[in-house]
Amino acid sequence: IEMGRAFIIKEYQMRPMPLFLLWRGIVHTTLRYPEHKYLIGGVSISNKFSEFSKSLMIEFMKSNYYDPYVAQYINPKKEYKVKLKDADKDFVFDASKADLNKFDKIIDEVEPGSLRLPVLIKKYIKQNAKVIAFNVDPLFNNAVDGLMYIRISDLPESTVKPVMEEFQSEWEKKINFLKDQE
């Protein structure tokens, strides 16, 4: 199933509610079809970001959320080449200490115009996603696309629980309806 913000009209794309509703739909689907074990998706890092910031983001994700086992089977057509000095890496990673929110603030400080770590990357990471590859997409304004996956069983309880409660409520209504019909 292909779902993404491209299906949302432009004026609502950067708002949190559509993304929340998309994730809610994803959770509903995974609960209805438990034979599917993984979600796979792409996240884009816009070419509006500097090469330095793009390199920082990729290194940060590879340092903290990379799955080398799965990544060995993926070969990007046009792999993004990280351009960072070791001193820059050490400074940023010492300052952020693998904390997504601290890292997001670093990107905000480095980038002009209030650019932050892309929302979809933050959302995937908060859902326990793993990154496996990065590719430059010349057909999408040379954005860097990250390929990520989530093992359904690794979704946080805070994501699944509200939908499970909704399922439970629906189930109870159906049972009560059937009892009333007897």
Question: What is the predicted role of each segment?
Answer:
Residues 1-2, 137, 144-182:
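Non-catalytic substrate-recognition and accessory regions of acyl/acetyltransferase enzymes
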Residues 1-130, 135-144:
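Acyl-donor binding region in acyl/amide transferases
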